[in-house]
């Protein structure tokens, strides 16, 4: 392939896919399937179920398959090609991450975004590329899923996840769960391990402050909700928050023709420095999980307090509009509605709005999710066993699940729900235990490899009797016995009762 010449996209991808197949063959990957089949009441038990087929779920599935664990399924409630936030509620123009990060490539060069991009557009265009366009990243993930032939079941919602007395995990699914679809059916599957690859929402969901509860839903939204921005043309729109999503939603409203957008920020100044970027290294990726608990808390508390800044591009995208207004040191002190008009009070003024968007992040309270109700009371949180220093309070961190080294939940009461050890939390809620390896692009491959290796080890241990029996039964000889004779036997000097090894 000429590194400086654009190829026809289809031809370029075809060549790249051939290279990937060759790379995998040279590495003898995927490994042959090795996990003994298990059935229950005549039903084949899945070795691994992954809930969520976004970037984290796909990467985990790919690594499991490379390790020879192919009796697996991914379930995602989104239609095919719409998994994750990238073309739903993510509203930035480009990714924040630098374009050269290898992301979910699992140390396979031909699986990187760069390889995918250059195969279609050439190296010169890669060099000219500023950052990865958001929609193009989704195109890459669709290709990733296809080229690895990952077993995703779309339009499928998990209605209930519960453990059984035999140690298996039962999932009640609603298939065909597209909004408005009448062609739905329920199905129950059994799994030995379940991975919750549920992204930024983690175990909880969108966080909206209590002050907003009385505002009718048609007048407000969370930044992760579907929003009809075209309907906001000429309207007065407010956005609460200083995150990247706050600016992206403000920009989306402005670009759709909003008459005025007011951005309300609690802080007196926008954060300017992404502190965790300053210590990004393999040491952080592989060392965080081994830190003492007090240091884990200290690192993430400081990161939360300093807060990652919105990307400069996102801020400039909003600031370019004359009808955009930034209000610093402006927490909401009052919020009410008068008919279809919202009245916002801050220490610096009163504002009337037609629509209000809360870019206020997510919470990790597992007991707010109906599908997790059977296991939620048993899940140990950090608050159940760890007390931070008095000057370092943080309720979001305190509600994080207290995971083991395998990303698995731990029991609040030992012995009450032992199957939790096979339910793995591979999403944002894992950050306090494992670091930022279960959802962000920079270290997603490292996290997926850690998870998949842990599951492989657990499956082997659980089937050790079967593997030992296979060890004993194995009888493929490598020597025929006629390669070289015993000199002492030929001389007749070996005692007849000499034991064989």
Predicted regions and their residues:
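Conserved N-terminal glycine-rich FAD pyrophosphate-binding loop of Rossmann-like flavoproteins
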Residues: 78-106, 270-287
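A short alpha-helix-loop-beta-strand transition element characteristic
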Residues: 86, 98-100, 106, 124-128, ...
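Tryptophan-centered motif/residue detector
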Residues: 82-89, 116, 143, 366
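Flavin (primarily FAD) cofactor-binding/catalytic cores of flavoenzymes
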Residues: 2-78, 126-256, 262-501
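A conserved beta-strand/loop capping segment in the N-terminal third of enzymes
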Residues: 103-138
């Amino acid at each position: 392939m000429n590194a400086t010449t654009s190829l026809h996209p289809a031809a370029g991808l075809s060549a790249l896919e051939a290279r990937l197949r060759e790379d995998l063959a040279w590495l003898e990957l995927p490994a042959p399937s090795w996990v003994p089949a298990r059935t229950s009441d005549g039903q084949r038990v899945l070795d691994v179920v992954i809930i969520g087929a976004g970037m984290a779920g796909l990467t985990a599935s790919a690594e499991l398959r490379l390790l020879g664990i192919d009796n697996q399924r991914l379930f995602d409630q989104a239609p095919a090609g719409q998994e994750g936030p990238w073309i739903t509620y993510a509203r930035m123009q480009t990714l924040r991450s630098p374009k050269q990060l290898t992301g979910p490539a699992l140390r396979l060069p031909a699986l990187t975004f760069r390889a995918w991009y250059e195969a279609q557009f050439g190296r010169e265009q890669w060099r000219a590329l500023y950052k990865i366009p958001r929609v193009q990243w989704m195109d890459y993930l669709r290709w990733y899923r296809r080229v690895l032939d990952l077993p995703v079941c779309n339009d499928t919602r998990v209605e209930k996840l519960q453990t059984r007395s035999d140690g298996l995990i039962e999932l009640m699914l609603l298939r065909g769960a597209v909004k408005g679809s009448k062609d739905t059916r329920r199905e129950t599957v059994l799994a030995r391990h379940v991975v919750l690859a549920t992204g930024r929402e983690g175990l909880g969901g969108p966080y909206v402050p209590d002050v907003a509860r009385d505002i009718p839903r048609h007048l407000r939204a969370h930044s992760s909700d579907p929003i009809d921005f075209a309907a906001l043309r000429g309207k007065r729109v407010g956005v609460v928050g200083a995150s990247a999503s706050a600016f992206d939603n403000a920009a989306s409203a402005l670009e759709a023709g909003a008459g005025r957008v007011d951005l309300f920020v609690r802080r007196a100044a926008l954060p300017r420095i992404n502190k965790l970027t300053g210590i990004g290294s393999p040491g952080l990726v592989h060392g965080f999980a081994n830190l003492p608990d007090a240091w884990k808390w200290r690192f993430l508390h400081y990161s939360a307090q300093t807060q990652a800044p919105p990307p400069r591009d996102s801020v400039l995208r909003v600031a370019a509009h004359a009808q955009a207004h930034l209000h610093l040191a402006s927490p909401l002190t009052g919020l009410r509605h008068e008919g279809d008009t919202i009245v916002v009070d801050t220490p610096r003024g009163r504002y009337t709005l037609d629509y209000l968007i809360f870019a206020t992040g997510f919470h990790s309270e597992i007991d707010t999710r109906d599908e997790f109700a059977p296991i939620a009371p048993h899940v140990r949180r950090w608050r159940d066993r760890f007390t931070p220093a008095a000057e370092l309070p943080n309720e979001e961190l305190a509600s994080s699940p207290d995971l083991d080294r395998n990303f698995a939940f731990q029991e609040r009461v030992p012995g009450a729900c032992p199957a939790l050890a096979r339910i793995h939390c591979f999403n944002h809620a894992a950050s306090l235990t494992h670091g930022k390896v279960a959802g962000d692009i920079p270290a997603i491959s490292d996290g997926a490899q850690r998870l998949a290796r842990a599951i492989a080890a657990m499956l082997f241990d659980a089937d050790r009797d079967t593997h030992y029996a296979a060890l004993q039964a194995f009888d493929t000889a490598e020597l025929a016995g006629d390669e070289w004779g015993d000199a002492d036997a030929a001389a007749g000097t070996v005692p007849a009762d000499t034991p064989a090894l």
